[in-house]
Amino acid sequence: MKLNTAVSKRLQGLLAERGLSQYQLSMKSGVPKTTIGNIVNCQYDSTKLRIIHEICQGLGIDISEFFDSYLFCEENLEP
């Protein structure tokens, strides 16, 4: 899968685990809701690490925890 798809799926999973909406995450992280929606809907070819970091802060996790998922295993990602 493409990296943007993995980021999207991971974010969707974290939102579901925490029972948060995109709007709620936007309010907690300071990342615009439209940006979060674009990430979830794979509208970006890539997402800046700074944005992922801000999202992680809103979720209350370290960036390493965000990427600690089978979704980001080398065999799951396209080169």
Place the predicted regions along the sequence by residue.
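A short, Lys/Arg-rich alpha-helix, primarily the initiator
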Residues: 1-20
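Conserved hydrophobic/aromatic packing and binding residues within compact polymer-binding modules
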Residues: 11, 25-26, 36-39, 66
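Residues within the helices of the helix-turn-helix
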Residues: 12, 23, 53
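The alpha-helix within a helix-turn-helix
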Residues: 15, 26, 56
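Recognition helix of helix-turn-helix/homeodomain-like DNA-binding domains
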Residues: 31-46
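Short, charged recognition helix plus adjacent turn
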Residues: 38, 67-79
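Short, basic-rich loop-to-helix N-cap that marks the start of a DNA-contacting helix
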Residues: 43-57
